[in-house]
């Protein structure tokens, strides 16, 4: 059994503030340890549950945040940016039986600690076939095309509620309870590590490869906080304005859909100015 862990940071233990996840800040240095603790707890739990291999794919910002030297020696870690499937890189090779979303968060325009979708503030909403979409929902549709089920999700309490919609059978662990976008009631690292390890052990038997999903076409709509970003986004082939601050595109598969999404957000981020967005 091989498990892939997609590891994001905003939903990690103790994280509530932008500086907690911004590489190079003192707070980020401190929170890296708690982030690593969450991920390693999942690693240990999956091995407890019978996994033969666990591959961690770093999925936050520079994708160079986890402390490799503090991970269980049986695990392997894919670190660094510019990967074809970004947050779920590694799922496409046909050897992954289940995936865990560790440190995830809710989507842009919704309640939740550090809620966003890919870009911190420029994207104010994302919809997939008319349903508001978090990164978790988007990624769940991508991995489903490879027959890989989501078996574990960790983050704040609202992230767990969000995951009930796209991975109802997955085990969920709330490491903190949402108070506002920048505040939460947090559990200690020792407690969350124990909870995540236990949940991962329970989740391991759910890692059974399924028939690849064929649910397309997929229409993705993005809303931005400034109208000029809609014009910028239409540089990407197939992307058209659908409103003053919105664009939309349709892809036959989520593989193509997520790659177009990444292209749009990359181009849009280059057009955001420091003072006015």
Region spans (language model):
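C-terminal accessory domains and tails appended to enzymatic cores
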Residues: 192-277
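Glycine-rich nucleotide/cofactor/substrate-binding loop typically near the N-terminus or early
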Residues: 39-94
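Active-site rim beta-loop-alpha module in soluble metabolic enzymes
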Residues: 142-204
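N-terminal glycine-rich phosphate/adenylate-binding segment common to multiple enzyme folds
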Residues: 78-121
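Short glycine-enriched loops at secondary-structure junctions
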Residues: 6-12, 59-60, 102-108, 157-158
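Active-site glycine-rich loop that binds ribose-phosphate moieties when present
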Residues: 83-84, 120-146, 154-158
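Extreme N-terminal starter segment of soluble prokaryotic enzymes
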Residues: 1-4
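Short catalytic helix/loop segments, enriched in acidic residues and glycine
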Residues: 19-43
């Amino acid at each position: 059994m091989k498990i892939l862990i997609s590891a994001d940071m905003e939903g990690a233990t103790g994280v509530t503030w932008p500086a907690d996840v911004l590489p190079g800040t003192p707070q980020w240095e401190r929170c890296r340890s708690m982030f690593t603790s969450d991920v390693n707890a999942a690693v240990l739990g999956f091995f407890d549950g019978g996994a033969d291999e666990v591959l961690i794919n770093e999925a936050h910002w520079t994708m160079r945040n986890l402390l490799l030297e503090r991970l269980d020696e049986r695990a392997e870690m894919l670190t660094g940016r510019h990967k074809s499937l970004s947050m779920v890189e590694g799922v496409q090779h046909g050897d992954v039986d289940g995936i865990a979303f560790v440190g995830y968060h809710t989507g842009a325009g919704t309640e939740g600690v550090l809620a966003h979708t890919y870009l911190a503030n420029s994207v104010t909403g994302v919809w997939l076939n008319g349903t508001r979409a978090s990164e978790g929902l988007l990624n769940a549709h991508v991995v489903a095309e490879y027959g890989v089920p989501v078996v574990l999700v960790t983050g704040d309490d609202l992230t767990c509620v969000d995951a009930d919609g796209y991975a109802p059978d997955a085990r969920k662990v709330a490491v903190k309870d949402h108070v506002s976008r920048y505040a939460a009631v947090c559990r200690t690292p020792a407690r969350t590590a124990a909870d995540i390890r236990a949940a991962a052990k329970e989740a391991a038997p759910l890692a059974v490869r399924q028939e690849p999903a064929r649910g397309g076409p997929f229409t993705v709509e993005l809303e931005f906080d400034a109208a000029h970003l809609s014009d910028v986004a239409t540089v990407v082939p197939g992307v058209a304005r659908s409103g003053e601050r919105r664009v939309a595109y349709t892809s036959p598969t989520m593989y193509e859909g997520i790659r177009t999404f990444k292209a749009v957000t990359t181009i849009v981020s280059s057009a955001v100015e420091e003072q006015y967005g």
